[in-house]
Amino acid sequence: MTEPTFPRRPQAIFLMGPTASGKTVLAMALHQHLPVEIISVDSALIYRGMDIGTAKPGADELARAPHRLIDIRDPAEAYSAADFRRDALKEMAEITEAGRIPLLVGGTMLYFKALLEGLSPLPSADPEVRARIEREAETVGWQALHRQLQQIDPIAANRIHPNDPQRLLRALEVFFVSGNTLTELTKISGEALAYRVHQFAIVPLDRALLHQRIAQRFHQMLAAGFEHEVSTLFARGDLHREMPSIRCVGYRQMWSYLADETDYDDMVFRGICATRQLAKRQMTWLRGWHDVHWLDSDEPAALDRVLQVVSA
């Protein structure tokens, strides 16, 4: 009796790493050596008009290797992990059907997790419900809404700080829209990714070197016109500091400076510190990641290592 044969799952490559670790440089090199198409996995690169502070690939880089899922939202618009998973799966299918390999590059680890493991069946954002919650917050304050969440979903309330309006808003919204708590819904597992995924994490082994690069990059952004970029957003009038776009590292600190809440030197210091904290959180995610190949961003053989694994 002939054994049944099953179609081999298509390949995909994850290239993960903290900010300023050299992901883009390696991705560009891989684009030259492999039949790959790059998909950005970055919650900041999705926004139009936010180029300098996000270290978005330049026009020359994009001409040589186009990146999908960048510049797809206005800074006033929301974009969730569920939105990313939907869009990424669509892009991956198109790339695979063209006989090429999706190369997913970035540092938004929640997006990678959502794509790899699937998502719990959480409801989509509801503008009317959100507006109602925000109006209530203006009246009674977020502390009172946190106490309300403590009654509805104590487990989520214990995880969410009273001064984190974005997560607090989402937890309440989920309950009011679905009738189920965030804790209940997140226990339901999602659909795993139907690809053979080669996972790589690129990091500088010397933490001091990473910190040096972060500071250097921040100063380069300032020299490139970061203040003007944020002042353009600031002047629009429809954006505020609690929006996900303005909460991006660097933008929030520059926003405070433009609002005359801090001086220039303090803004620079806080921006660099916030970027270092982001890198630390990204590294914490990566240390708990399974089946990942570690790459030293300062090792010239990193490219060869990826090529060897993917070609095996």
From Swiss-Prot:
The record marks T108, R130 as: Interaction with substrate tRNA. Its EC number is 2.5.1.75. GO terms for biological process: tRNA modification. Residues 42-45, 166-170, 247-252 are annotated as: Interaction with substrate tRNA. The keyword Ribosomal protein does not apply. ATP binds at G17, P18, T19, A20, S21, G22, K23, T24. Its cofactor is Mg(2+). It catalyses: adenosine(37) in tRNA + dimethylallyl diphosphate = N(6)-dimethylallyladenosine(37) in tRNA + diphosphate. InterPro entries: Dimethylallyltransferase, IPT, P-loop_NTPase. Substrate binds at T19, A20, S21, G22, K23, T24. Keywords: ATP-binding, Magnesium, Nucleotide-binding, Transferase, tRNA processing. GO terms for molecular function: ATP binding; tRNA dimethylallyltransferase activity. It is an enzyme of class 2 (transferase). Monomer. Belongs to the IPP transferase family. Catalyzes the transfer of a dimethylallyl group onto the adenine at position 37 in tRNAs that read codons beginning with uridine, leading to the formation of N6-(dimethylallyl)adenosine (i(6)A). This is tRNA dimethylallyltransferase.
